[in-house]
């Protein structure tokens, strides 16, 4: 697996026409992951069940974002599209990273092999009590924090209802860590639809400081 928290190279699709009108000159996104432990994820990882993506994953690897888009509902696809459209990373940095259960922060186009995919699906829990999750995340968040120029915003596209994301990320990014205010009170499907609509309309959401907000909606990922 190619570890991409070296921050080398920008995605070619992080530019958008609204850049001059948005809230900050520079902005990156952190995406909560999709669940590889569900039925679609397990079918993809099962060598006895044939699929184009599963076969490619076993033969040569596949991009992490592709795996999550395959297994996810609308929510992850919305997060990925929104981050790619509205990110304005500083020179030399990625515009978005995916929070993982045991590999810290990975760029969406990181190629993972079948062993890594199975580890992400069945290994560490996204729980602050699990060092396999917490330590790599803090390591990569600290490295990213040191690489970011002053004024660059870090936007969490994920739940702020529990401490599993907010607490470790806040320790590294402090006040620059934000989240979309419109996420409050919405479930995952509603958030995904909202994010895709924002991309279609070239309309960026308003962000608030990331603090734990209690119950947000039916699901919190």
Give the label of every model feature segment:
Residues 2-221:
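Peripheral peptide segments
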């Amino acid at each position: 697996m190619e570890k991409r928290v070296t921050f080398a190279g920008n995605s070619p699709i992080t530019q958008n026409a609204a850049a001059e009108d948005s809230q900050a000159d520079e902005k990156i996104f952190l995406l909560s992951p999709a669940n590889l432990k569900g039925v679609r994820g397990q079918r993809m990882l099962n060598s006895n069940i044939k699929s184009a993506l599963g076969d490619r994953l076993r033969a040569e690897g596949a991009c992490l974002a592709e795996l999550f888009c395959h297994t996810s509902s609308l929510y992850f696809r919305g997060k990925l599209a929104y981050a790619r459209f509205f990110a304005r990373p500083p020179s030399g940095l990625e515009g978005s990273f995916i929070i993982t259960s045991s590999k810290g922060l990975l760029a969406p186009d990181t190629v993972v092999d079948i062993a890594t995919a199975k580890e992400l699906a069945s290994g560490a829990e996204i729980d602050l009590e699990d060092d396999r999750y917490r330590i790599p995340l803090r390591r990569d968040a600290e490295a990213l924090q040191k690489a970011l120029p002053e004024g660059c915003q870090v936007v969490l596209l994920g739940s702020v209802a529990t401490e599993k994301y907010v607490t470790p990320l806040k320790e590294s990014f402090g006040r620059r860590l934000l989240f979309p205010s419109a996420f409050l009170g919405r479930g995952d499907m509603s958030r995904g639809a909202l994010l895709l609509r924002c991309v279609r309309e070239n309309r960026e959401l308003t962000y608030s400081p990331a603090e734990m907000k209690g119950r947000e909606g039916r699901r919190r990922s």
